[in-house]
Swiss-Prot record:
Ranges of Polar residues composition bias in the record: 1-13, 806-825, 868-888
Region described as Disordered: 1-39, 797-927
Superkingdom field: Eukaryota
InterPro entries: FHIP, FHIP_C, FHIP_KELAA_motif
Protein name: FHIP family protein AGAP011705
Biased composition (Low complexity): 889-906
Pfam families for this protein: DUF5917, KELAA, RAI16-like
Amino acid sequence: MSWLRSSPLRQSFSKSGNNSNSNGGGSANDRSRSGAGGGGLSSVIRPFDATECDPKACYDSFCIHWQQAYEIIQRSESHDDVLGVVTHLDHMVTLLLVELHHCNKLSLPGQPTPPAPCLEHLLSENLLDKLYEWGIKTGRYANAVRLEQLKLYEQLVSHSRHQLLVHEPFLRPLLKLLASSQNEIYPPDVEKRLVILLNQLCVVLMQNVHLLDLFFFSTTQTQQSHHASNGGHTNFIIFSLLIPYVHREGSLGHQARDALLLCMALSQKNSNVGTYIATYSSICPVLVTGLGGLYSRLPNQIEIKTVDWYRITTDDVTELPELTLFMNSLEFCNAVVQVAHTMIRQQLLDFLYQGFLVPVLGPAILQTNVESQVSAMAYFDLIVRSITEPGLIQIVIRFLLDEEKFDGQRILDVLVERLNSNDSRLCMVTLSLFDSLLSLNCEDIMLELMLKYLLHCKHVPISHRYKINRVDPYTQAVEYFLNITPDIMKKVNSVLSINNGGLASNGASSAAAGQPAVVATAKTIGANWNHYGLNTTTGETLLANYQAYLLDARNRIVQCKHACDQWNNVYRYQKLSKANFTGAPNVAANGAGSSGQNSLVNPEDVRALKQLDSLQSIGDSSGYESLNVFSQTSNDLVAPGTMPQEPQLKQQQQRIDAWKVSSVREEPIGDLDLSEDLFAQGTVSLGPFLTAIWGKLQTFTSNCLYVNLHLTGLITHLTLFPLPLLHSILLRPDIPTTSDTPSFHQVLKILKQQIDAELPDTDESLEIVDMARSFLVDREFRLVNMRKNAIESAASGKLLNGGGSSMTSSLSQTTPMQLTPSSSYDPFKRQDGKRKSISNSFSNIFRRPGSVGKNPPSFPSRSSNSNGLNHSPNGRQQPQSYTPASMNVPSPVGQQQHQHQSVSSVMPPSGLLIGSSRRESREAETQFMSIDTSSLQAGGINAPSGHVSNGSNGNDLLHPHSLEHGLTSYSVGSERQLNLAIGAVLLDEWLRELSAVTQEQCIMMLSEQVQQQQQQPPARTAS
C-alpha cells in the first residue's frame, strides 16, 4: 500500500471526536510512542490503572514535581539540570494523563464534571509558558529541551481532544514553540516529533473545524510578535511547517503528506485556509518541482531482461526506490486535486502542465534513443494508469494534443508513429500505452485518433451508408468471424469436440460440423491435459470458452457505454448539409470543456439518447442467458435461414427512430453529392492510427507473439465503444470500405489464407497445433498456480524479500515455488464491489512468469493487465478482462479463489475480474516471481524467462527467440511452423472474441431500442 492507504488519513476524514476519544490518540500517536527512543517522555507510555489513583495525592505530587523542576530552571543550565527537568516533566505528564482519563469518562446527565486540579494548576500558573522561556535559554541543550516539549504537547493534544486548544495558557506557548521552529534545521528525532505533533493538530482541527479560525488568527498574532519575515500577511503556521517534509522518504514523509492533505481538505471548509494556501504558500511550486526532480532521478534506460516485458508493475515500483518516491509524489498530487479548494486545484494543475508535463515529460518522450524512448513511454503509461482525477486526466490529454509546445508536432502523433517500429519492445510499450489511453474513455482521444476521419463517412460507398446504423447485419457478422478461422483450427476444434464426448469447444457455432473423420494420429489431441487433474469432458480450460467470451464482452461493453454516455456528442452517421459538415471534424476538440453548441446534434437530442445500461436486467445472468436473449431477439428480426423483408425492416425503423439520429427513410441516395464521393474512391484515409494498426496486423504471422497479444487486444478494445461508425470498419463485414489500405476484414482473410497455405490440414500440422495449444494451457495453469502460491505465502507470513535467488519447482507439480518482494505499496488498487467474472482467468494463457532482477533499474518479466489499467492494476486500475489478444493475467479476486482450491483441481472457471473500469483494471495487475528456467522444462515446456539470478547457472538461459514461444524442446515441425501454430491458435481465439463482442453489441443496441420504444408516449388515435 502507498502512504495514502497505510496512513490513518482515510479514517481521520470521517472519524468523529468520540471515536478519537475512544482510540486515545490515533495512529499517529501510536507511532510516536513506538519511536520515542530512550528516556524523556517515552516513559509515560507505561500501563497504569487510573482507578487506583487518589486525585488529592496526584495533585500534591504534581505540584512537588513542578516546584523541584522550577528550582532547577532558576539555576544555571547543566546536563544534570536539564535531565532533572525532563524527569520531572515525565512524571507531571503521567499525572496529567491519569487526570485526563478520569475527565474523559462518560458521565450521566446532571452529574458534576470530575475535578482536574493538575490541569488547572498547569494553566493557571502558566507552567508551559515558563517552560518554553527556559528552553530557549538552554544553549546547546535547546534541541533536547525542544524534543521533550514536542513530546509533551503531542501527548496532551492526543489525549485531551480539543479542550486544551481553547485555553490561551496552553495555545500561546504552543504557537511560540511552532513559530520558533520555522526556517530551522533540526536533528531527525526532533523533526519526527514536530511532524507528528503537526499531524495531531491537523486531525483535531479536522474534527473540530470551529476551532480553525481561532487557531489561524492566533497564529497570525504570534508570527507578528516574532517579527517573522513573511511580509506581514497572515500565516497558517501548521501548513508552512509541513511543506519542507512533503518529499521526504519513509514514515516522516507519510506523516507530513497526511497532515498536508488534511489541510487541503480544511481549505474546502474554511476560506481563510484556502486563500492562504493558494495565495501565500509555496506548496504548488514545491510539489511540481519536486515531482520533476524525482522524475529526473529515474533510470533513463530500463534494463529489460525478458522478451515479453511491456509495462511497469507495482512490484517494479516497490523494487526501485526512486520510482517509489516519484509515485508517492504523483499520488499526493492526485489526492490534492481531489480534496483541495478550487483555487488550489487550478493552481496545481497549471503548475503541473507548465512545470512538469511540458518541460520534463515532453522532452523525455521525444528522445531519439530507442532504449530511452521505451523507458519514457513506460513511465508515461504508469502515470496515465495512476491518475484518477478528471482535472489531471484533462491536462494529460491537453499535453498529448498540444502543437505549440513541441515545435509544431504533437506528442500523440509521435506515439502513433512508434506503432510502426520494428523494435518489439518499443512496439509493445506503445501498444500498451494506447490501450491505457483508450481505457480513459476520453472523447478527445477517440476523436483525434479515429472519429474525425470517419465522421464524413467517405470510407463507406454511398450505396452502403444506409446500413451503418442498422442492427440486423450484426447477426450475420457473428457467424462471419467464426467461419473465417483457419482450416487447421476448424479441424482441431472438431477433434477436440469428438474426444470430449461431442461437446463443441466453442459452444456457439456449428461451423466445424461435417469435418472428415479424424485420423488415428490425432486422437491424442486433448488427452495430454489430464496431468493437471482436470476433467477433460467439461471444458477444463478457458481456452475456446465462448460463454466466457460473451460474459466478458457484455460487462466491458456496458462499462464502456456508461463512460461514453457522458460525452458531449453522439457520433452516429447522419446526412448533413455541407454547412453542417464544415465544422464536423472539430467537434469536441476541447474535450471535457467543450459545450453542446459544437455537437453534431442538439444537447436535448444528446440527453434523449442517454439511457440506462441496456444489459442491467441481465447483468447477473450467465453467458447462456445472453445467448438466449440474442437468439430470441434475432428471431424477432429475421427468421432463421431467410433474409429480412424490406417492409419489416421499415416498420422496425419507424418504431425505433430514437436510437439513431436519422432513419433510412430520411437518407435517399439521390440527395447525396456523388461527385465528391466518386473522386474519393480508393483514396480515403482512415487516419494514421488505424493505418498503423492495419499495417501491424498484416504482418501478424511474422510478428512476435507478445506484439500480437497487445495488437489484437488493442483492436478488441476499439470494438467495445458504442460507435456504429467504428463498427462499420471493425464488426461489419457487409460494409465495404474505400480506404487507401486493405480493410480490416480483408486483412483477416489474408491471414487465414497464409495460415491455410503454410499450415495445411495434415497429421503433422495437427500435432504441431496440439503442441501449441498444450503450451498455452500449460502456461495458463503455471501462471495461475504461481500467483496462487504468492498469495498463500503472503497470507502465511512466509513471503521472502528481495529477488536475489531463484526457487525451483517442476512444472509437473503445477505449483512452482517463487519469490516476490514483500511490499505494501500499491498505487493502482481500487475498491469496487462490481460483479466479477471468469474472463480474466483467460489472461493467464498468454502471459508469462517474470524474474526479479537484483539491480533496481532492471524490470524483469511481470504481467499486468494490458487493457488498462486501467483501472486495473494500475489501478487501474485499473482495471481487466480477457481479450484473447490481451490475454490478461488473473485478478486478485480470482487469485483469492484459487487460493481455496486444491492443487489437483486448480481451474480458472469463475469469479475473476473482468474489465469493468480503469480502476478495476488496475486491480488486475499481477506480479510474477523469479523462477529458474531450467526448472520449468517438464513436459517439454520451457519457461519464457530470460533472467537467471545469482544462484542459477548461466547455461540455463534460453535463446531469446526460443523464449518467445517456449516450444524449442519439441522435435516436430520447423520454427516457422511452430510460430504459425501459435498464431493460428491466437487468431482462432481472437475471432471467437470478436464474434462474442459483435453478438453483445447487437444485444446492447436491441435492448436500447426496446427501452427507447417503451419510453415513447403512445400515439394518439384520431377521434
